[in-house]
Amino acid sequence: MFTSNTDDDRGQVGIGTLIVFIAMVLVAAIAAGVLINTAGMLQTQAEATGEESTDQVSDRLEISSTSGDFSDVNTLGAGEGEELEVTVEAGDATAAGEEVVIRVATSAESGFEDSKAIELPDEAGDPTTVTLDNLPSIGGALVTVDGENVQAVTEDSVDLTQGDPSVSFNVDELSDDSESTIGLQLTADAGNNFWDEIAEDNIEDTVTVQLTDYERTEAEITNVNNWGSDDAEIEWEATVPADEGDYAVEVIGFDSARMLPISTNEVASTTEDPELGETDTQIDNLQFSVATAPGSDAIDLEETSVQFIGDQGEETVTITDRNVENIQGVDGNVLTDNSDRALVSFDPVADIDGFNRIEESEDLTVIFTTASGASTETELRIPSTFLEGDESVRL
């Protein structure tokens, strides 16, 4: 009635079942590996995101103060819309890679893009070409290329009234950086009543003389002769940090543009029959005193971008060596300590593409963004009036 089992009657595992079992084990192992890898990847991403977020919070600039330098500009209503193509190349290896400023002498006519800052290619002989837009219609324009470490060169016969005007420059390094002077002597025509319209002690607030050099240096009155007579004379003098170079002198305040070519250690003389013109006061230099935020790592200012948003549009620029001045502790334009201070300056016309000088009552938002992506924003409120006698204003 009972049947005994033998070895031949034991249960057998089929090959198919064994394959399925092994496959399930492999799938489980692979799944475990994927989970481990995914967890590791997520952890790495989380750590990177955390570090990036920390950098964006900590590697940030602080702006301790903002200000603007202002000067008089002519509002002559001259013809506009001319373009000029300017090509510049370094004549030798020492001038290669230098930053230069191209300036067209316009007697500081308001609204014109008369300046542009560029960096020369790193190889001597390699040209770089830029276009200056919206220039006045001048038959014999004076165009200057100058840099902190290059010799100034001026072309004095550029006709902006002809189709597609262009000019080329070859610049060399300064051979001597000792200071020199440039002067202007202005004499009124006999019988002209120009000098009767202004007081002798108010000349400097009425007529301004400046150069087309790297920093657009403003000249100072050094002598006044025969005031009130038919041959009254005013003498101006400016100091430039080089003993060689050619520039243009611009006179601001007359009813028409006055520009003269001049070389260092020379005095230009002109006899005029001037009438007072319309002038305005506008900001031609924006300045920001910056430091690192507490806990920040070192910040390279030359890897920092600055966005300008205002009535004139929106434009982003990258800080260059030309824009940075060391106030305290800054080495190589890098802020390494919270006590380091730098002054970052911008010429609105030369440095910000499409911008002109900043007018009264303009609003401007400025955003500094470091290499880590950390941003610092400041709002500039331009006063509705500038106090007479002042040369700068806090913004």
Swiss-Prot record:
GO terms for cellular component: archaeal-type flagellum. Residues 1-11 form a propeptide. Pfam families: Arch_flagellin. One of its GO terms (biological process) is archaeal or bacterial-type flagellum-dependent cell motility. Keywords: Archaeal flagellum. Its main location: other. GO terms for molecular function: structural molecule activity. It is found in: Archaeal flagellum. InterPro entries: Flagellin/pilin_N_arc (IPR013373), Flagellin_arc (IPR002774). Belongs to the archaeal flagellin family. PANTHER family: FLAGELLIN B1. Flagellin is the subunit protein which polymerizes to form the filaments of archaeal flagella. This is Flagellin B3. It comes from Natrialba magadii (strain ATCC 43099 / DSM 3394 / CCM 3739 / CIP 104546 / IAM 13178 / JCM 8861 / NBRC 102185 / NCIMB 2190 / MS3) (Natronobacterium magadii).
